């Protein structure tokens, strides 16, 4: 492959060569654009829109539109797009991923495709990873768009629905991936069309696309409501988990033992597979659980909840670690983001894992939540007509972007050559020796005034290192808490000479680290990685914090044989070999085998994580098809379409299904079980029971026809009871919405239960995914049949007394990815009306006797 690349150039080089003529065209237009007055430049927007209406395509407009934005940026921001930024802008317009190194001005690049695509008037979403960046970019880059006459909006966590709707109506909207996803889910829970906030998903430009579409894609977005379940089972399972004994992982059985047929006895009550983060009970463990709960068989369907909860308790004790995965603060368990190391208030693990950790830590166990709506980022972003992304690191995950999102990655060359030195990893035997070496390196760099950024993986590691530096008297700043506006300032100051900053993973990503002159002459920013991350991409992101725009700098990773990566994925034989060499304390080990082993371990984990995400997507695909059907049906109701034909079809379907269920095709009418037919049909459609004399000598189809005619007449009689025809049409919509929402929410829960129990199918030599699909489709069919029955039953039994109003089926209590910013308090616009005041709507009655009645 490498030889072919040398002969023909890499994929990226070939693609860039192909778009260079466009770049030349944009460059040629520069003098013309500079000659225009501000008003003439602004007038270009109107001109382009008119040309689009006359049939010109966006691709034909691209050179002029990009030249316009380039000139506007020069006038407004005093920043002019470099050639490489123009290349990036073209790649983004084509719906691809532009890999641009840190400091190459990705934010400015996005203005080009955002402007061009906004000309169509269908809206453009610029998606960022947090509220701070969304607000900063909207205020900063928004100036260019506003200068050119476009409206720019920004959606923040604190906005109300009305404010969100207004921001989404703008030509270009800056928003975080979580807010956008949750707004989509909330839009599919509203009960009036006027409550919708989003417009159609037309074009998205995703900043830090690897973070959004890959790192965060392992957890779906979930909107939850309160569940009625008790929390006692979590506490009981926690008590039992503490008494259970951990056994040896069967994976440690060598290949030779397997070939020789050596039988390894199961040990302990449960086995933990740290690589895949799975806990399994042994036979002894199953017996212990059955004895503890006084049950006969743990595998019985009615014991599924106990089985699920004991596994959760064991996971909480053996795979979830305090100060690494979560922290305990103010009697609450708060999650730590594994990618940024930030605390995330308001976010909770789903499936009851959060409750299991609360029981483990002896804090108040909160009621489990019920999922009201959910979607994965993969399925959500694939709804956009066109999407593009930019990041500093995407090539290592190109296969995933191609397979799942249909996007290829084009590496954009840097504006100036990279001057950063990436040094060989330093490997030590123990963690203690490694930390000693890191402190030494920081002390040496600090002595000559070179700024240092130390990247850690966990909060615990950053605090440990901070203590060691404090003992050495090195002044430093630590960044590991939740994102706050100070963070960007601390990160920006990390390039000042003599600065020492310790930060978890990607804290402050999106903020440039600029060097002062003294720091530049001291060798630029020195990056120290205290551990290799599971993903090479995140290591590359840390390296990329240094050496922006041709600045000097260096990066080096320090590793010990005790690190999780080496312990879990390094080969036992290699670690044993280094231990046997008797290397003296604090001696750095340099060996080609080690560097290769680290690279191999990371590739193993990356493909493992890709597998997890692909698996999640395959399972979610089943739900996605069902979600599309339900959401489309809801939208028809919201759009105010007449549901009369839908209801008539439901009535005839119920008659068909009931007759088919009770009456055999070839049975004579004298053999029909009328008692059963009436007992099934009459509770739903209140007809006169069918009598024997009505049907003598009848065929099955004639029976169906007779019942359908009676049922339709019954419904027409119900319609006649309503003085206004629109009243029954609205009643149909109210009942349909209520039934669909109730059944869909229960269905999400049922599918969740099915998913948790489906793994057991593997023991029966069945493919769990195939079984899940089959069972899922059966459950969906059953749900749609239930929707039909409940809707028809409610409509035919309803009494006309008062005007019906729509109401939401469940109250939303939270989401699993809440941003930490609180909602702004709602201010009352008009004066408060008290019960004894006259009604403000002019009825002449007191308010409490008129509109104030509940």
Regions found by a protein language model. Name each.
Residues 1-582, 631-632, 649, 653:
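Conserved P-loop NTPase motor core
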Residues 91, 839-840:
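Short alpha-helical segment immediately N-terminal to, or the first helix within
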Residues 104, 845-846:
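ATP-binding Walker
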Residues 468-470, 835-838:
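Membrane-interface amphipathic helices and adjacent TM-edge segments
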Residues 833-835, 844-845:
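Processing junctions and N-termini across compartments
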Residues 841, 848-852:
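Cysteine-centered loop/knuckle micro-motif
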């Amino acid at each position: 492959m490498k030889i072919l690349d040398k002969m023909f150039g890499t994929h990226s080089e070939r693609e860039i060569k192909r778009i260079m003529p466009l770049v030349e065209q944009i460059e040629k237009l520069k003098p013309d654009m500079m000659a225009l007055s501000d008003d003439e430049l602004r007038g270009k927007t109107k001109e382009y829109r008119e040309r689009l209406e006359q049939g010109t395509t966006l691709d034909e407009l691209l050179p002029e539109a990009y030249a316009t934005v380039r000139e506007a940026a020069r006038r407004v921001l005093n920043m002019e797009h470099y050639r490489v930024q123009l290349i990036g802008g073209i790649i983004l317009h084509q719906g691809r991923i532009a890999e641009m190194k840190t400091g190459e001005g990705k934010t400015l690049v996005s203005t080009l495709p955002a402007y061009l695509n906004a000309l169509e008037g269908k809206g453009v979403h610029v998606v960022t990873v947090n509220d701070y960046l969304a607000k900063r970019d909207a205020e900063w880059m928004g100036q260019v768009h506003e200068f050119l006459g476009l409206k720019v909006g920004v959606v923040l966590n604190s906005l109300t629905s009305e404010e969100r709707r207004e921001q989404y109506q703008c030509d270009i909207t800056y928003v975080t991936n979580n807010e956008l996803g949750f707004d989509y889910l909330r839009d599919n829970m509203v009960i009036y069309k006027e409550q919708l906030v989003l417009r159609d998903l037309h074009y998205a430009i995703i900043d830090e696309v690897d973070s959004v579409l890959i790192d965060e894609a392992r957890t779906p977005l979930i909107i939850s409501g309160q569940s009625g379940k008790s929390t006692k089972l979590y506490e009981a399972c926690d008590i039992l988990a503490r008494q259970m004994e951990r056994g040896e992982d069967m994976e440690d059985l060598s290949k030779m033992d397997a070939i020789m047929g050596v039988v390894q006895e199961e040990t302990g009550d449960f086995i933990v597979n740290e690589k895949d983060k799975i806990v399994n009970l042994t036979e002894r463990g199953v017996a212990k659980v059955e004895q503890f709960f006084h049950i006969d068989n743990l595998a019985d369907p009615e014991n599924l909840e106990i089985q699920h909860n004991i596994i959760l308790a064991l996971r909480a004790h053996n795979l979830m670690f305090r100060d690494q995965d979560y922290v305990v603060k103010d009697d609450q368990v708060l999650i730590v983001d594994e990618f940024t190391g930030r605390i995330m208030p308001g976010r909770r693990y789903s499936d009851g894992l959060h409750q299991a950790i609360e029981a483990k830590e002896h804090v108040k166990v909160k009621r489990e939540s019920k999922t009201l709506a959910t979607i994965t980022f993969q399925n959500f972003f694939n709804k956009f007509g066109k999407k593009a992304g930019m990041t500093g690191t995407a090539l290592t995950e190109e296969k995933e972007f191609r397979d799942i999102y249909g996007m290829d990655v084009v590496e954009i060359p840097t504006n100036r050559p990279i001057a950063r030195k990436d040094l060989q990893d330093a490997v030590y035997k123990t963690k203690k020796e490694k930390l000693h070496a890191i402190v030494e390196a920081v002390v040496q760099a600090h002595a000559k005034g070179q700024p240092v950024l130390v990247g850690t993986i966990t909060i615990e590691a950053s605090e440990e290192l901070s203590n060691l530096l404090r003992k050495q008297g090195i002044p430093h700043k630590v960044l590991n808490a939740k994102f706050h506006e100070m963070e960007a300032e601390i990160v920006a100051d990390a390039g000042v000479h003599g600065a020492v900053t310790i930060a978890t993973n990607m804290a402050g990503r999106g903020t440039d680290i600029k060097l002062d002159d003294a720091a530049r002459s001291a060798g630029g920013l020195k990056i120290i990685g205290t551990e290799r991350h599971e993903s090479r991409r995140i290591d590359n992101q840390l390296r990329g914090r240094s050496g922006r725009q041709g600045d000097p700098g260096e990066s080096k990773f320090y590793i010990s044989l005790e690190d999780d990566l080496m312990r879990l994925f390094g080969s036992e034989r290699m670690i044993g070999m280094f231990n046997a060499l008797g290397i003296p304390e604090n001696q750095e080990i340099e060996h080609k085998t080690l560097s290769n082993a680290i690279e191999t371990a990371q590739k193993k984990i990356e493909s493992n994580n890709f597998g997890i995400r692909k698996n999640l997507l395959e399972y979610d695909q089943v739900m996605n098809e069902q979600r599309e059907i339900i959401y489309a049906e809801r939208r028809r109701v919201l759009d105010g379409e007449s549901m009369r034909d839908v209801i008539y079809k439901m009535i005839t379907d119920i008659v068909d299904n009931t007759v088919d269920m009770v009456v055999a095709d070839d049975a004579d009418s004298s053999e029909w079980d009328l008692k059963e037919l009436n007992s099934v049909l009459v509770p739903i459609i209140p007809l006169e029971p069918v009598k024997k004399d009505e049907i003598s000598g009848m065929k099955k189809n004639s029976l169906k026809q007779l019942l359908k005619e009676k049922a339709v007449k019954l419904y027409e009689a119900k319609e006649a009871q309503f003085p206004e025809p629109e009243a029954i049409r609205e009643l149909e919509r109210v009942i349909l919405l209520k039934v669909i929402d109730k059944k869909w929410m229960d269905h999400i829960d049922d599918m969740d239960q099915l998913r948790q129990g489906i793994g057991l199918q593997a023991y029966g030599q069945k493919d769990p995914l195939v079984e899940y699909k089959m069972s899922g489709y059966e459950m969906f069919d059953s749900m749609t049949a239930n929707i039909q029955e409940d809707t028809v039953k409610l409509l035919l039994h309803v009494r006309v007394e008062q005007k019906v109003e729509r109401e939401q089926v469940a109250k939303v209590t939270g989401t699993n990815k809440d941003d930490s910013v609180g909602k702004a308090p709602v201010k009352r616009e008009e004066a408060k009306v008290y019960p004894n005041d006259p009604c403000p709507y002019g009825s002449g009655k007191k308010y409490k006797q008129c509109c104030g009645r509940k």
